[in-house]
């Protein structure tokens, strides 16, 4: 993304509200409720990951294509959480240009709510003309644990496809905890809005707090 295009992109994306944050922080729920309430369109970055993988190449998304070539144990069991963090393609911003391509192709009226962990602070900030158009939800480890357990714990989805689901779960939780720490540091350094999400946070509370940031 060329810095020469930043002012133009800010203007083209001024109708967008951005909700980033750690995994399992409530981004999807909040974005869906606000989009319905405000009559906005909704763009969930999780929903387009497979499409973006198809539209990418090993040259522009090398980490993604290495990940695709791994088996489930190589992805989630055999590597240290820090290595998993540093080599996870979406955490490193691969494919973010495809998100922007998608957003530019969508109608600008009446507004667009965009959510997902792929919205990295340093990539989003240059696109936001007003600081109240972006917020990151930061889950505590306890909140993340509760969310994962509610989804089935070690038996949840891809974890159950490994030879050691318990270890895969521990690795995933540690990787995601560290990713949230990275988001916390980066948003603080860039002066961006964040909301801490813990086990006392209700869905309605979280929606209201995001509305305050967005001034809706």
Report residues per predicted region:
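NTP-dependent small-molecule kinase module
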Residues: 3-4, 178-216
